[in-house]
Amino acid sequence: MIYEDILDTIGNTPAIKIKNLSPEGINIYVKAEFYNPASSVKDRLAKNIIEEAEKKSLLTPGQTVVEATSGNTGVGLALSLIHI
């Protein structure tokens, strides 16, 4: 599949069945969030925050966004912000 923008790859991550860890008759699935561009579930959160802020006109061109995190949320926000 070809995407027009890196942000289009966020979400719709696959669910993978874990076969060897579950008791008989129990199915365990995990979401493979590492398929997101910054390898984190926080990519989805950050994209949603930015999209909602844009819809509400809370972001303007040239505005500085400050996020008090050193974790995956900050990475996801940085990724989303450079593509708006």
What annotation goes with each model-predicted range?
Residues 1-82:
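PLP-dependent amino-acid enzyme catalytic core
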